[in-house]
Amino acid sequence: MVDAAGFESVAQCPRELHQMMAAAADGLGSIALDTTQLNMSVTDPTAWATAMNNLGMVPVGLPGQQLVSDSICVPGFDPGLNMMTGITPINPMIPGLGLVPPPPPTEVAVVKEIIHCKSCTLFPQNPNLPPPSTRERPPGCKTVFVGGLPENATEEIIQEVFEQCGDITAIRKSKKNFCHIRFAEEFMVDKAIYLSGYRMRLGSSTDKKDSGRLHVDFAQARDDFYEWECKQRMRAREERHRRKLEEDRLRPPSPPAIMHYSEHEAALLADKLKDDSKFSEAITVLLSWIERGEVNRRSANQFYSMVQSANSHVRRLMNEKATHEQEMEEAKENFKNALTGILTQFEQIVAVFNASTRQKAWDHFSKAQRKNIDIWRKHSEELRNAQSEQLMGIRREEEMEMSDDENCDSPTKKMRVDESALAAQAYALKEENDSLRWQLDAYRNEVELLKQEKEQLFRTEENLTKDQQLQFLQQTMQGMQQQLLAIQEELNNKKSELEQAKEEQSHTQALLKVLQEQLKGTKDLVETNGHSHEDANEINVLTVALVNQDRENNTEKRSQGLKSEKEALLIGIISTFLHVHPFGANIEYLWSYMQQLDSKISANEIEMLLMRLPRMFKQEFTGVGATLEKRWKLCAFEGIKTT
């Protein structure tokens, strides 16, 4: 028989039991039942057999073995069993029950220990019996079904037993010895399932109404399923939000919005086009404006100035390209030097191997050493040959490039160079002609625009000024037409000179062939008839003199034509420059502009050319004292009127 005083002593010290339950909740160990609080010994098999006989249970025959071990586990417990994704598996330990994680294997039957509460006692089932069965766990299950309760069990007793598993939110008790318990968290259900199979006895009574075998199982509840669905939807929203943030982070940035065209925005864009750092952004805006069709007669001048600013960056880009090409050439040179050094070291290594294979040193090596040296030598020679072929290929390419750049001294090549120079000058004049034609079209457009404005406005002072501008533009247009005709005549003259040079070349070649045949004939005559060498030398001298005289005449004619053509070209360029500068320009300004077109021209040459044409250019003095400055102006239109 179990001593009743022992249970009374357990009931009288709830503080010690509470401390034991709190210590068991930390998951670091287990606290067995304090044997000092019971009169019966935990290790006494006779006392356990007597107590189990009183309950109508078959006593466990484990003589001499401790029934409740210091470290006991939850049999067959899986922390991740039927639990939702995202919930961290926890240690299935019930506070106050003295339970710890299981070390023994599943094949060994684990003995549960007796659980004492204030109002009842829980006895474990026979460890030889199979564990109680459970149904499939519903998703988000927080509610358990508890059956086999004693008839006299109250909600307070049930709460006292199951509140050790966790916070209880609701208990629904039925009159048929079962109830439903809803916990605050899902992992608490696993702790409650552990109590399935325990026999519950109220107090120390042996009445059937005060005892019953507990059956704890999962229960379906709409509230649990609804909360589980809410959590799933919340996780899905979080996942979608996370994916959206990731897509936004990986998506390339959208291009900046392009503002609409206005005169103010056009002025700002013109300033940006002149800045190298903002050029790429500004050129995109300019392209979009032109594609949208913002160009009309009123905005044509602004767009022309912006296109001109864009064209001014071509020289900068070419300079950058030249810089990169220079860097590439330097890198090629460094690579070639490094390759030469590597090839030199390969030659030295191969020389070492060749010296090692000579009879004087080869006899002292073993067979294995000779084999290794032979393999190394062959490998080094293959690498040396490959490097040498690569270096020779680089040198071959450089020689081909140099041969393309070299100039031959033959007379036919000189004539070809002269022809190419004339063709280049003709092409330059053609480009200048096209440029003047485009300027003429621009002036015509301006004249038409002024005519339209004149028809729309009344005859006022502003109209009078516009009439003057119109007359001035007409005069300018006439002057440009005259310049265009003059340049066309020069172009035709150059074409005729080019044809004449070709004819002279063919004539010179024919003359050379004839003289060569005559020379050959004279040599034959000398050999056959025995003429003296002096006659042959005289013939050669006469031939060379004729050829040289012909060459000198051709070069004099060509140099005189080139000189007059250059002066005409300079006059046309200076006239165009001074025409767009109605207030005149000093000689330094003119020289800086012409220096960009011809780097060999000097300021003195320009000034002498201007002084030779007093009807086209005149010199004026502006300013007083230290600000006194000489300016050259275009007076060709005034000179035409006076003549």
Swiss-Prot record:
Transmembrane segments: none
Enzyme Commission identifier(s): 1.-.-.-
Domain spans labelled RRM: 142-221
Cellular compartment(s): Cell membrane; Secreted, Extracellular space
Pfam families: ENOX1, RRM_1
Principal subcellular localization: membrane
SMART domains associated with the record: RRM (SM00360)
Job of this protein: Probably acts as a terminal oxidase of plasma electron transport from cytosolic NAD(P)H via hydroquinones to acceptors at the cell surface. Hydroquinone oxidase activity alternates with a protein disulfide-thiol interchange/oxidoreductase activity which may control physical membrane displacements associated with vesicle budding or cell enlargement. The activities oscillate with a period length of 24 minutes and play a role in control of the ultradian cellular biological clock.
Protein name, entry field: Ecto-NOX disulfide-thiol exchanger 1
Species the sequence originates in: Mus musculus (Mouse)
Lineage of the organism: Eukaryota, Metazoa, Chordata, Craniata, Vertebrata
